[in-house]
Regions:
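Short beta-strand->loop
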Residues: 121-129
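Residues at the C-termini of beta-strands that transition into short coil/loop
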Residues: 38-40, 70, 112, 128
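Active-site neighborhoods of divalent-metal-dependent phosphate/nucleic-acid chemistry enzymes
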Residues: 2-5, 66-114
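A generic structural signal for short hydrophobic patches within well-formed alpha-helices
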Residues: 14, 41-44, 74, 116
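Conserved glycosyltransferase catalytic-site signature
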Residues: 11, 38, 93-95
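Short loop/helix-cap segments at secondary-structure boundaries that form the rim of catalytic
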Residues: 25-29, 114-121
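Short, well-structured N-terminal submotif of metal-dependent ribonuclease cores
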Residues: 1-36, 45-59
């Protein structure tokens, strides 16, 4: 029996689901139990346009595990920024998200190929919806 794949879902996929982009909701449901990072929560709340949207995001995320920052995630994110920020345009929060997936042994689900595709050690899946 093989272990189920553990997924860390990136901000773009969650935004697609919140906006009811065709296929995004079923894709998330197909993952089973998935998690999101504190960096993803920060991006979502930063992009909220009202308190109503903040409450909707909180409610939507409440059933899922949030992976919090750790010292190891911070150190790995720093290494990722130093190595990939210029050639691939990987930003600070994307580096934290990638580091979270690597440290937790998870597969990152994201449509953002440019920022994540070359990061060494990152298991990466591009949703097809």
């Amino acid at each position: 029996m093989t272990a189920a794949t553990l997924y860390l879902v990136d901000t773009d996929v969650l935004i697609d689901a919140f906006r009811k982009i065709e296929g995004a909701g079923p894709y998330l449901n197909s993952l089973g139990e998935w998690s999101y990072s504190t960096a993803t929560a920060m991006e979502l709340f930063f992009g909220a346009r009202s308190k109503k949207e903040i409450h909707a995001i909180e409610k939507s995320l409440s059933s899922y595990r949030r992976v919090r920052f750790s010292h190891e995630i911070g150190e790995l994110a720093l290494d990722i920024v130093k190595k990939y920020a210029k050639p691939d345009g990987t930003g600070e929060l994307d580096a934290v998200i990638a580091a979270t997936a690597i440290e937790e042994g998870m597969t990152l689900a994201s449509r953002n190929k440019k920022h994540f595709r070359n990061i060494e050690g990152l298991k990466f899946e591009v949703p097809e919806y």
